[in-house]
Amino acid sequence: MKKYYNIEGMIRNGYKLSRDYQTLDFSYARFSDDAMQALAKSRSVKQVRRLIITGKKLTAISAQALAESNCLPNLESLKLYKNKIGDEGVKYLAETEKLPNIKTLRFAWNDIGPEGARSLADSSQLGGLISLVLSDNQI
């Protein structure tokens, strides 16, 4: 992993864009797997309930960072439209115990196939899920 030096600045800007401290929107920021790995370790995101990162070509590496993070216990909604997390990334998120409050997953346009859909359907960790968007994938 490359060292990502300005994640705290990006987090501050993400809060400004969303105008509250419960939503982080990085839709208009330059964001990469390295940035996601840094964000997942940042203590500045503990209160985040909604995380939006669209169109950034994030891969399973980002999904794994989120799934292994101890810094997002309050996350309820995750929108990762137009990325590339794929079946492997979905599996990380479906199996994690570290996102206990997740209610909404929005993964349209993410190169997810039948295996990823099966991981979500079989997950014992997503009992509180009330909304799932998988449109425009290869299911």
Spans of model-derived segments:
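Compositionally biased, intrinsically disordered low-complexity segments
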Residues: 10, 48-51, 88, 93, ...
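N-terminal segments that cap or nucleate solenoid repeat domains
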Residues: 1-51, 57
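C-terminal capping segment of individual leucine-rich repeats
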Residues: 17, 41-44, 68-71, 95-98, ...
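Concave beta-strand-loop units of leucine-rich repeat
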Residues: 24-31, 51-57, 72, 79-84, ...
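Short, solvent-exposed loop/turn at the beta-strand->alpha-helix junction
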Residues: 4-8, 29-37, 56-64, 84-91, ...
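Structural register of leucine-rich repeats
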Residues: 22-24, 37, 46-49, 64, ...
